[in-house]
């Protein structure tokens, strides 16, 4: 793994914000090298990365401390408060991105904050995580930097615990990955319309929420959801887009994936 070998030909949110002078940090409770995360965040925005080993180096946890993927989300949120205050004190634009993992497959991690509300461990962990996110957001709203700060909350994927979903009798439920924006700077041109969108659309939408003006309201294959423009799946349908994305692309394989002209 090098510092910039993860799809070096793409231009990501971190690249855009770096160009605008943002201080950027990625905060996780596990090893930064897992799944190429270090390569991506160093190569696309020069993020400072605070991971499991950073917490050890700073004396926050003992050398032999290891739960779940490294340290639990309860600690992650507390560390994030310190990091946010440090970033805000510089009086420069900042982007703190953090990844929670207590709700990961299988069954999640039961921390000291979890309550025994439900019969299933996973249900208790999900409820506990929701409370922690809510309390963290409430804390952010009380800080001086909040008025000029946008918060994006996004799931990376649905749960992989299909057995749990079946036990909850939720197999017929149209499950969606959670995504919301709090205190965004953009105005929604379709406030009462249910949108059909994919992860591709979150790129321009997130930047628009930060106040970025996007010519044509499109970046890459994504559409700014604040705009009145149709997304690709609204225009062509999901099945058609899936077929097109499976086709071979020389642009992707050479330019985006490997950074070659």
Predicted regions and their residues:
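Solvent-exposed soluble domains appended to multi-pass membrane proteins
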Residues: 1-261
């Amino acid at each position: 793994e090098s510092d910039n070998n993860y799809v070096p030909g793409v231009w990501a949110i971190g690249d855009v914000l770096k160009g605008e002078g943002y201080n950027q940090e990625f905060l996780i409770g596990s090893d930064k090298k897992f799944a190429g995360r270090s390569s991506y965040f160093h190569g696309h925005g020069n993020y400072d990365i605070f991971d499991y080993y950073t917490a050890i180096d700073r004396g926050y946890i003992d050398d032999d401390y290891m739960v779940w993927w490294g340290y639990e989300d309860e600690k992650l949120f507390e560390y994030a408060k310190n990091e946010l205050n440090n970033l805000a004190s510089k009086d420069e634009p900042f982007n703190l991105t953090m990844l929670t993992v207590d709700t990961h497959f299988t069954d999640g991690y039961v921390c000291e904050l979890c309550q025994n509300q439900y019969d299933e461990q996973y249900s208790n962990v999900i409820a506990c995580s929701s409370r922690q996110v809510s309390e963290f957001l409430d804390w952010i709203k009380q800080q001086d930097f909040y008025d000029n700060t946008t918060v994006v909350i996004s799931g990376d994927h649905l749960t992989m615990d299909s057995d749990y979903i079946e036990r909850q009798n939720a197999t017929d439920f149209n499950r969606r990955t959670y995504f919301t924006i709090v205190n965004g700077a953009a105005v929604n041109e379709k406030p009462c319309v249910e949108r059909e969108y994919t992860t591709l659309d979150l790129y321009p939408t997130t930047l628009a929420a930060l106040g970025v003006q996007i010519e044509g309201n499109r970046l890459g294959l994504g559409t700014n959801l604040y705009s009145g423009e149709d997304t690709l799946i609204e225009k062509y349908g999901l099945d058609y887009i899936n077929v097109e994305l499976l086709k071979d692309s020389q642009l992707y394989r050479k330019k985006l994936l490997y950074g070659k002209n």
